[in-house]
Amino acid sequence: MRALFWADIDGLPSTKYEEKEQVMSNIKLVTVALVALSQSAFAQIPPGAGGQMQQIPPERVLQKKAVPPIRIEPVGTPASTAADSVKILVNSLNVTGQTLYSEAQLVAITGFKPGSEVSLTELRAMAAKIANHYRTNGYFVAQAYLPAQDIKDGSVTIAVIEGRYGNITLRNQTNLSDPLASGLLDGINSGDTVAIAPLENRLLLLSDIPGVNVRSTLAPGTEVGTSDLIVDVTPGRRVTGSVEADNAGNYYTGEYRVGATVNLNNPFGRGDVASLRLMTSGSGMNYGRASYQAMFGKTTLGVAYTALNYELGKEFAPLRAHGTVEIASIYGSYPLIRSRNTNLYALAGFDAKTFKDEVDLTSSVTDKKARVLWAGLAGNHLDSFGGGGASSYSLTQTFGDLDIETPAALAVDAATARTNGHYQKLAYHAARVQRVTDRISLYGAINGQFASKNLDISEKMGLGGPYAVRAYPVGEAYSDEGYVVNLEVRLLLSKFFEDMPRQMHLVGFIDAGAVTHNRNPWTNGDNDRTLSGAGIGLTWAEYNNFVVNAYWAQKLGNEVATAAPDKNGRFWIQLVKYF
């Protein structure tokens, strides 16, 4: 206790005598209050404004849409009139119409051997192998066929129609800006070969726009071998959002919380979204975030304002401690890769943060500001490895500058943690869901961060709560550096009960994490901590409709919780309804 609050006051930088006396007076009063609280096993420093922001859960967003359907209108190909049963001597096989592959490559694919006697059926099978090769490599409208021909000297020709775009038409039936919509189709031009990858990329970018639906049609063009592309953009839902409830709040500001998010989609035709998110635990914590973002080509740019106020209760109620957080933000994202199976986004932003903590018992006020620039990458990938799986990952580099404006708090910081000033942080995340059987899947995730120096609590990571080691409370072990690992075995109950609605999983899990409290310790106390737990859970969800998560976690080991009363087990419940 003394190491935290007295912090070698005599070693503070030279200040006015009166200011040093005020520091001593305030620290003594807080110390007296905390000594009274220290009789309980879970006493800790009062959680301030920066720590309160840590309890806000990730925003609940609708999952991205699947690849918009591509309807292909059939087109006939000329066929040979020779009888199927007739066998002919073929000395050479020629391929015409190809540009993407050499003739030798395509002939090799057929397995043709010069001097063979083959039937029309066998020749058609060779043509089918060529067509299948094109389609396997993404040229999904390509055709290969036997044209009507006179066979001379045993020479047979297979004709290839690789498929090229004819007319490209955008039929926009929404208020979405025509230049914006057509700009997302740039790169697909008349005369280009029809390939699935670039087409799906453009359709996905269009379908990512909130408030619109996208479908496309490939119809036979006016010229042989061409397909006209018609892209229809129709109105989607103008208002979306969610309501949520959980028990993942801070123990001292209210564990039970309710919240709601409302999105107004595409109000000005710029692929824009105006959003409002609110969350409350009652008088203990109230949170709100308003944001607006719009598209400029493929780039999304946005602004946001966040506000939070809190008031400590429970054992800290006698302090009459309360505070506020305000954050003004600008942010942006750009899709580096957008496809059916692989996505990668570049992200960046700037936050101007203001923190205020007040303790009425001691008439003390602590003001801090932070300017934070961050940039990163985030992506996901679907694959067929080991029966199929999905991976996600992110990496974020933060450059910040903390300004402790209250002289007394700055003096204490200078003698202890020295968080004031410039800092850097590198945060990482990786996760994978792996299919084992139709009923069983495995999940693994790791989250962590590295720091350049001791960090303000607003930049620290914690080990407790439903997104970390679930056997410990929210706010447990806030630290500068560390990691959390989550491992789960998931059993799909719907496979056992055919009438089971939606997707329901029984989950068994193990969580573990280790942290270094201070990057540069200033006391001789224990600076590291390791926590672990295990438990079971039940998850129930329907795509973009609702989510229910319930977990029971038991501690592994004897580490005592300090952010809330210690318990051997903890129960977490999360409810989300999308609209």
Predicted regions and their residues:
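Residues that define the transmembrane beta-barrel architecture of outer-membrane proteins
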Residues: 225, 254-258, 284-288, 324-328, ...
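Outer-membrane beta-barrel translocator/channel fold
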Residues: 306-328, 334-335, 339, 353-362, ...
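Periplasmic polypeptide-binding modules associated with outer-membrane biogenesis and secretion
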Residues: 20, 25-26, 44-249, 278-286, ...
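Feature captures outer-membrane beta-barrel proteins of Gram-negative bacteria and organelles
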Residues: 258-267, 286-305, 326-336, 373-381, ...
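Short loop/turn motifs that connect adjacent beta-strands in outer-membrane beta-barrel proteins
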Residues: 267-273, 298-300, 337-344, 382-391, ...
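Transmembrane beta-strand segments that form the barrel wall of outer-membrane beta-barrel proteins
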Residues: 240-249, 260, 271-282, 288-290, ...
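Membrane-embedded beta-strand positions of outer-membrane beta-barrel proteins
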Residues: 241-243, 262, 274-278, 301-305, ...
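C-terminal transmembrane beta-barrel domains of outer membrane proteins
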Residues: 3, 414-579
